[in-house]
A protein has these predicted regions:
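N-terminal signal-anchor transmembrane segment
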Residues: 1-79, 100-107, 417
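Alpha-helical transmembrane segments of multi-pass inner-membrane proteins
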Residues: 2-3, 14-16, 73-77, 97-105, ...
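Loop-to-helix entry and N-terminal half of a specific, functionally important transmembrane alpha helix
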Residues: 30-39, 362-395, 410-414
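A membrane-periplasm/extracellular boundary helix in multi-pass inner-membrane enzymes
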Residues: 212, 216-217, 234-279, 288-295, ...
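A conserved mid-to-late transmembrane alpha helix and its immediate loop/hinge
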Residues: 219, 298, 321-362, 390
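Hydrophobic transmembrane alpha-helices and their immediate junctions
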Residues: 234, 244-247, 343-387
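Transmembrane alpha-helices of multi-pass inner-membrane enzymes
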Residues: 354, 379-434
Length: 452
């Protein structure tokens, strides 16, 4: 049956790519669908597995999956939209890709490691498709529109869950930590556009949805980091220039804080009330297990198999991780320790460089044209990447395809928008030089005329 699904997958790609080629005016709808499906592919199972049978695997990738997001990305690339990706992005991703591939040679179960290679290949595909789409200035906001609606839709489900008595809600994502981490990729660039004065009404749903997720999620990391990121973004945006929109947002933010703070504190208090008091620190135990694994395997144990090695190798036992399914089947709650354990410190470093490269490039270009909406979005994307990088010190969920899809989209937007701004700045500089040259030539002509 999976081959039938794959056949239809190919047919849809062919039809959609032809539609994109033949209907340039309709392309924003395709970009919108890509942004929206990044939030809906997992909860509505808009995917199929080319290699089933991995459902009981202990790792975070459980097959050769293809999602609706991948289908749209394939169609965009097949439509013939051409645009070179910045070299620094290609090199950063290539380094990470090669290190992950090298981990397959030291893996206990090499085929499981190759599943993660497949997943990051899909991530690269999405990133390239977004970058090339940004050759059209309509693409970035269309993609952001889809992501904002997808996030807000999840936030509404969180409200419903909370109203029904759920202490913590993960919306449609299944877990509040995943929903909280994913919200950074969308809420912050949307807020940056709002602060910059963009007039699209739907943009307000971004920061509003992010605030709702903070309240209904009850996640300590999400609450602290999201509020800190909003404050940092507001400060940086104000440094770029003050306007009436920022004054209005500051007032609304104060009102929102007065309303939301008691709700968030109440959620956290209820969460801690039901938790049993104990001296056991599970996150610390996970980190001890990962540290021992890294010491024994400096080049890693293979992608997608931390939990296998942690249990079979006795690391969880020696680190004091309690004996139950939830704890022994969990990854270390720190993405950098997890990548270091699986792909070696080089793998962790390559991932850090991938994030740093994107964040720094976005921040750099956000100051080149401060009144340009593209620069404002880049500022939000930079803060979003930085916030996610810090959040990942307390979570492993960046390894899931749902989170990586949004990371790929944001990196693609950064690459595309940075290239646009770079070209605009170069074009303006060229125009100024030509204007100056024209004035000089005109002045010389006038001098000659007076001399004659």
């Amino acid at each position: 049956m999976r081959f039938v699904y794959f056949f239809f997958f190919i047919l849809i790609i062919a039809g959609l790519s032809q539609f994109i080629r033949a209907n340039p005016a309709q392309r924003p709808k395709v970009w919108f669908a890509l942004g929206l499906s990044a939030w809906l592919a997992s909860p509505y199972h808009l995917l199929f597995n080319l290699w089933p049978g991995w459902n009981m695997w202990s790792g975070y990738v459980k097959g050769l999956e293809l999602t609706f997001v991948d289908m749209i990305a394939f169609a965009i690339l097949a439509s013939g939209i051409h645009k070179r990706e910045p070299l620094r992005f290609r090199l950063a991703y290539l380094a990470y890709f090669l290190i992950v591939i090298s981990s397959t040679f030291v893996s206990t179960v090499p085929s499981a490691a190759w599943l993660y290679v497949w997943q990051i290949s899909r991530m690269a595909l999405i990133c390239i498709a977004i970058t090339r789409s940004c050759a059209d200035e309509r693409a970035a906001k269309a993609i952001m529109f889809g992501m904002v609606l997808g996030m807000f839709y999840n936030a509404l489900f969180g409200i419903v869950d909370h109203a029904k008595g759920a202490l913590q809600s993960g919306g449609l994502m299944g877990h509040q930590n995943l929903l909280g981490l994913m919200s950074h990729f969308v809420a912050l660039p949307a807020l940056a556009l709002v602060l910059g004065g963009s007039r699209e009404k739907w943009l307000w749903l971004g920061p509003l949805g992010g605030l709702i997720i903070v309240v209904v999620g009850g996640s300590r990391a999400t609450t602290g980091l999201a509020l800190g990121a909003y404050a940092l973004l507001f400060m940086l945006s104000s440094m770029q220039g003050w306007n009436s929109r920022k004054a209005m947002v500051s007032g609304l933010a104060l009102i929102g804080l007065i309303v939301a703070a008691p709700l968030a504190v109440n959620t956290l208090n209820k969460r801690f009330e039901v938790q049993e008091k104990s001296d056991y620190d599970e996150r610390a135990a996970f980190k001890r297990a990962a540290s021992m694994m890294i010491a024994d395997h400096p080049f890693g144990v293979g992608a997608n198999q931390y939990t296998l090695v942690a249990n079979v190798g006795g690391y969880s036992q020696r680190a004091g991780v309690v004996w139950n399914q939830g704890s022994r089947a969990a990854n270390v709650h720190n993405i950098y320790y997890l990548y270091a354990a699986e792909t070696g410190w080089l793998g962790a470093l390559a991932f850090i460089l991938l994030l740093a490269n994107a964040g720094l490039l976005a921040f750099k270009h956000s100051w080149k044209r401060r009144n340009d909406w593209r620069a404002q979005m880049l500022l939000g994307l930079a803060v979003g990447i930085a916030t996610t990088a810090v959040h990942s010190m307390y979570e492993w969920i960046m390894t899931t395809y749902t989170a990586q899809n949004l990371l790929a989209i944001d990196i693609g937007l950064i690459a595309g928008l940075s290239t646009q701004i770079k070209r605009s700045v170069a074009s303006e500089a060229r125009a100024r030089r030509e204007s100056g040259r024209t004035k000089i030539e005109t002045g010389r002509a006038e001098e000659l005329a007076l001399t004659d």
